[in-house]
Amino acid sequence: MTKEGKVWGLTEPLLQSPAVEIHRIKVEMGGYCSQHKHQSKINAFYVISGELEIQRWKDYGLCDSTRLFAGDLSIVPAGEMHKFIAHQETEALEIYWAELNHTDIVRENVGGI
């Protein structure tokens, strides 16, 4: 997997599967991503170094803002508009996953001994 340049810095996929993705991101001081949402993916940010602000838009267009430092984690639910801003040069893990339906089993018969 290869690094990809972004306007705000670099992203490097570490793991990509149908159910989960993990990217290492390096964001330049002052760098920010677009305001966006994911239809079905949950998006988490775990800061390794630096300072990353996560903005999340809630009901009535109100914006909640959380500043993350090394060791901090923030989780953005699927469908929620969000954006990140680096207040220092920042390295973080960006983790995506989809909720699994734990009742998605159809049994043809019953197990036994």
Each predicted region: which residue ranges?
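Structural motif
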Residues: 51-53, 73, 81, 89-91
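Glycine- and acidic-residue-biased ligand/ion/polar-headgroup-sensing regions
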Residues: 40-58
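A short, N-terminal "cap"/entry segment at the start of jelly-roll beta-barrel domains
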Residues: 1-24, 32-35, 66, 70, ...
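Double-stranded beta-helix
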Residues: 2-5, 83-113
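Short acidic-glycine-tyrosine-enriched beta hairpin
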Residues: 58-79
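Short hydrophobic/aromatic-rich beta-strand segments that constitute the beta-sheet cores
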Residues: 34, 54-56, 94
